[in-house]
Amino acid sequence: MNTNIVILGTQWGDEGKGKIVDFLSSNSSYVVRYHGGHNAGHTLVVNGKKIILHLIPSGLLYPNVIGIISNGVVISPFELVKEIRMLEKNNHFINERLFISESAPLILPYHIAIDLAREKQLGINAIGTTGRGIGPAYEDKVARRALRVGDLKNTQKLSTKLKVIVDYYNHQLVSFYKQNPISYKEILKDLLKVKDLIYNMIKDTSAILHKAIEDKKRIIFEGAQGTLLDIDHGTYPYVTSSNSTTGGIITGTGVGPKNLGYILGITKAYTTRVGKGPFPTELFDDIDSYLSKKGQEFGSTTGRKRRTGWLDGVALRYSVKINSLSALCITKLDVLDDLKEIKICTSYKDVNTKKIYKDFPIFNLEDVTPVYEVHPGWMKKTSGIKKIEDLPKAACNYINRIEEIAQVPIDIISTGPDRSDTILLKSLFF
């Protein structure tokens, strides 16, 4: 039995973390977002109704759960308020159950303006950011000039700090990028409006979590993006601006490593990626079209079509090691139901030297091609199955092979978008 569970992505994001957090949250006391911003979209389907969350922890759809947005997250206060109101329209009232770290940096309009201006200037060499200001907000944090959530509590200090930062960014926007300046007065006015709505949520969230651990409360740490987008361990420079690996939890919450507990990596039964960057198993054929359509592979934040490919076992092993994973959860198994054969990449071959890579060559991904195993498809419906014994034999063989390649057990299998479409192979909180 585990007190705390970490849930993080093993690929390039979009693995289905939100559903699994939602599935496990009914038996937890806290759900914690520890990095990223509103560039991540977690899609939940409850009783057939779809809800997309970008900042608010997924577990808050349960009335007994307390949500924490910790210091590692960069927060747009305007997007946060929009999300709170969206949930209220869906009869989820969370104002007294959501706490926001006073140390979390704010994302403000000048971050978005500079993000878009940089991408425009880079042209075909653009990174492909979501344009939400995430990277510039993290830059401000590291440069020690960020406005933080706690600054909203003191209007005089807020206005003084804001003026300095707006002047700094307007100089770049006007002089270098030839863009229109951002209005200091408009930002301040808008901040003062939202301040009152979230004022009582602003807390020392590290202290809340330390007390929860002392009281042996159950905590879920909810990751955003995926391991291969980690700023240090991902496919740089086509990465996010935070640590999406296990290490990001420690710095992003103030919770020490011995209290993390069980670390669950989420992986699709195939692979997807949004935006630019290397993708060894990427497909450009009818299978790509099939996966996109059957898997509804369009970004919940940007609406962009996701690139699709076969499951990459080399990258998966890398994620297992980087994160010290306890186990895996396989999602979207049902998407593969109609395929006659299914491939798994087990190694890479360098197109120049012909060298075979069994481990993830982080610096050489542009120069490799996948080496595949071919497995028979099951050609039977698996969607909605809730017991492992009801899966087709070929599907079970596919799952067993993934376990062998990853060298960790698969404890959860998702067979559809609803929280009930889940096979639990090991007791976690239950």
From Swiss-Prot:
Pfam families for this protein: Adenylsucc_synt
GO biological process, one term: 'de novo' AMP biosynthetic process
One annotated GO molecular function: GTP binding
CC cofactor note: Binds 1 Mg(2+) ion per subunit.
Membrane-spanning ranges: none
Record: residues binding GTP: 13-19, 41-43, 306, 332-334, 414-416
Catalytic activity, reaction form: IMP + L-aspartate + GTP = N(6)-(1,2-dicarboxyethyl)-AMP + GDP + phosphate + 2 H(+)
Localization per Swiss-Prot or TrEMBL: Cytoplasm
Principal location listed in the UniProt entry: cytoplasm
Enzyme Commission no: 6.3.4.4
The protein's enzyme class: ligase
Required co-factors: Mg(2+)
Binding-site residues, IMP: D14, E15, G16, K17, N39, A40, G41, H42, T130, R144, Q225, T240, R304
Record NCBIfam families: PRK01117.1, purA
Self-association state and partner proteins as the record states: Homodimer.
Protein name: Adenylosuccinate synthetase
Organism: Buchnera aphidicola subsp. Schizaphis graminum (strain Sg)
